[in-house]
Amino acid sequence: MERREEQPGAAGAGAAPALDFTVENVEKALHQLYYDPNIENKNLAQKWLMQAQASPQAWHFSWQLLQPDKVPEIQYFGASALHIKISRYWSDIPTDQYESLKAQLFTQITRFASGSKIVLTRLCVALASLALSMMPDAWPCAVADMVRLFQAEDSPVDSQGRCLALLELLTVLPEEFQTSRLPQYRKSLVRTSLAVECGAVFPLLEQLLQQPSSPSCVRQKVLKCFSSWVQLEVPLQDCEALIQAAFAALQDSELFDSSVEAIVNAISQPDAQRYVNTLLKLIPLVLGLQDQLRQAVQNGDMETSHGICRIAVALGENHSRALLDQVEHWQSFLALVNMIMFCTGIPGHFPVNETTSSLTLTFWYTLQDDILSFEAEKQAVYQQVYRPVYFQLVDVLLHKAQFPSDEEYGFWSSDEKEQFRIYRVDISDTLMYVYEMLGAELLSNLYDKLGRLLTSSEEPYSWQHTEALLYGFQSIAETIDVNYSDVVPGLIGLIPRISISNVQLADTVMFTIGALSEWLADHPVMINSVLPLVLHALGNPELSISSVSTLKKICRECKYDLPPYAANIVAVSQDVLMKQIHKTSQCMWLMQALGFLLSALQVEEILKNLHSLISPYIQQLEKLAEEIPNPSNKLAIVHILGLLSNLFTTLDVSHHEDDHEGSELRKLPVPQGPNPVVVVLQQVFQLIQKVLSKWLNDAQVVEAVCAIFEKSVKTLLDDFAPMVPQLCEMLGRMYSTIPQASALDLTRQLVHIFAHEPAHFPPIEALFLLVTSVTLTLFQQGPRDHPDIVDSFMQLLAQALKRKPDLFLCERLDVKAVFQCAVLALKFPEAPTVKASCGFFTELLPRCGEVEPVGKVVQEDGRMLLIAVLEAIGGQASRSLMDCFADILFALNKHCFSLLSVWIKEALQAPGFPSARLSPEQKDTFSQQILRERVNKRRVKEMVKEFTLLCRGLHGTDYTADY
């Protein structure tokens, strides 16, 4: 509790001896905390004050700090210290002092009833904590006693002050309960006790709220107190009178916010749905607010409309199932639904003119789920009633999704535009969900409206209306399979008729085409209707994201039908790339689109297109390779390498991706001869080496080079084989000069794909031995500066053991050094590195029997590994990593049982190891548990979690309740 040697001096004491926890020193430290301009001094003071609050002396100085002659800041600290002592150190208080402590707190609260409100609140919180710790046995009628004591007439404080102090105390009591650190069994007892005690609270609150003489401040406090108590899951029928009083209080503008909060909290209790009769009584009360709601909307009173909407939604959303079940009351519930519809369609643009409509969206999900969960017969009845409601909802949502006029939108802040974007996404999600209720009729409905809008000659249509209807289509088509819809051909036919005069409309047209790309793949004759629009949009930088992402979707989904358009697509793409119209990320997407496109062409066509597409970049790269390195040409190099790697990511002439997706047999025959990507890579290999020679010490450039090959390897798989020898050689030279994590990651890919093939084993083995040797040297020099390299190295070793354990049979591999370095890596502070090291050991230990050098090193150095694992569990590693260390223990037990049974007993015999908090019995129990469990990995993880809590002194604390 009290550790004097660690206390920093207060009040500028600096390195002076630690100060005693006296009233004077606390006051000096508080002065320093509030008024010293030096931030270090403030931090020292704060640390010292926290220690002071935890010290035994806090019981003494807290009361003195509450004296009337002290300023509120000092009194507040005294009250806070009392709360901390009571809530966190309750076990230190002798039982014979409970009553005197209670009496002192009552006295102080009475005194501060007419004093500082912040101090009063802290004292009330302290007394609330005391009550919770004493209930129900040591203080069985705590709440009734509080009410009785504060109603006593002999108090020196005026009745209003006493009343407000009592209400503050009653308000913080449930709040303190919600945040208290009571053990679970105590929490349950106290909750039951409080639920009984609400009988002493609610009549008082009703009386104060309903009597005309109660001042506004008292009635507001009553509502807050009620709001606090209902969160204890008080039966809704017991709250009926107070809820009705709160509804009446909604007419008072000063009480409006508190009334809303109280009503919403009462209605939203999880248990409230059991009290259907009370819920039915609430519907007329909510419907009775409609005039007030309409008046608020008319007057632009956003706060009032927002509050009333919260109440309606709370009732509808939390209890739709219970209210739907009351078939004889269907009309009143439908009226509530229509009231919520009014809130959804509240006039004005979100979030500038209104912030209410967004509250209602989840209600429509809930109502639909509840309707669709009924048995077929009942569902059919409700569908008849609510399908028209949901069609109306679609109209309302699409109206709300409309952009404002260009002029108005121009005045919106970037934050308002972002909120509106998110709001539209929420509307999109709702529309997609509503499709489940309305089905294909919804698409027909949208199509008819769009058709009428675009073909009407009576009046010019607004682009906003068109955009919203398209947005509705897009929302549904993005996630629902519309391939069998009979309206999509008509929609594709309508799109070219849209007069696009606005960026937002153009964006939505693009995204709608993108959402229909799978449909276009099944109806390729329609591609020509929309492709020209997409290619035209590519030239507009304002449509960068929508046009490029749409082209990428079309090239991915429709690639086998695009050869007739390939030349045009490549030409337009080349043009926009050369003009640098798009940002880097969109350029990368465009290259991926072209990769998909080229994959479906004949090899000669691919090579011809590749040549025209990348020649300008190769020439630029040749020029850059001659220049002296500087920041601007580095950016250009990384950009060009990025373009190439993104192109090669998707250029797959063997159609591996189609194999994964189980595509129809529309793909082209697998071409004979070298892969076009390999041809290009071989042509530019010397150039890439030249670039590397100048930029070897730049991680970004090395990463970009490795990315080209890594993405190519992942896409080409076995087709990459001709490149393996020269790439292994280049990687070896790179890594020998300056080790980089990206080179190890690429080596891991090569090991994964090619190490098991005899033809490629020699170059891969040579590379593996080389990078291992270089990395081991790095360990000797100080690996702590390179956690990323160590992480990648551990992943490489694990992959080697998984794919080709023979790599560990080579005499030139120092398995012992590798093992020791991996043990060292277990002690790194970086979690990913530790995880990777654990992953290596869980791959290594099962190989003890089959790979002789591995078995030998485990026998010789396995004890060292166990010690490191136990140290980590003992407290040296983050608790979040315990599952990884448990995996090592499980592997040791499963594959090296006889060794582990000796090592673990020897290791745990050492005094204070792995933690001074452990008893010999606890250590013995742990070792026996571990040695017994060789099958159930989950059980071992549970044992390790429990043991690490014991080691850290956290076992059984609330702090670890969710661990």
Curated annotation (Swiss-Prot):
It is found in: Cytoplasm; Nucleus. GO terms for cellular component: cytoplasm; nucleus. GO terms for molecular function: small GTPase binding. The keyword Nucleus applies. InterPro entries: ARM-like, ARM-type_fold, Exportin-1/Importin-b-like, Importin-beta_N, Importin_beta-like_NTR, Importin_rep_1, Importin_rep_2, Importin_rep_3. One of its GO terms (biological process) is protein import into nucleus. Keywords: Cytoplasm, Nucleus, Protein transport, Repeat, Transport. It comes from the Eukaryota. Its main location: cytoplasm. HEAT repeats lie at residues 24-54, 56-88, 95-135, 142-179, 194-231, 236-268, 276-325, 330-372, 375-438, 440-476, 487-522, 524-558, 562-600, 603-648, 676-716, 720-754, 761-803, 815-845, 860-893, 897-931. Residues 45-111 form the Importin N-terminal domain. Interacts with UBC9, RAN, RBM8A, eIF-1A and PAX6. PANTHER family: IMPORTIN-13, TRANSPORTIN 3 AND IMPORTIN 13. Functions in nuclear protein import as nuclear transport receptor. Serves as receptor for nuclear localization signals (NLS) in cargo substrates. Is thought to mediate docking of the importin/substrate complex to the nuclear pore complex (NPC) through binding to nucleoporin and the complex is subsequently translocated through the pore by an energy requiring, Ran-dependent mechanism. At the nucleoplasmic side of the NPC, Ran binds to the importin, the importin/substrate complex dissociates and importin is re-exported from the nucleus to the cytoplasm where GTP hydrolysis releases Ran. Belongs to the importin beta family. This is Importin-13. It comes from Bos taurus.
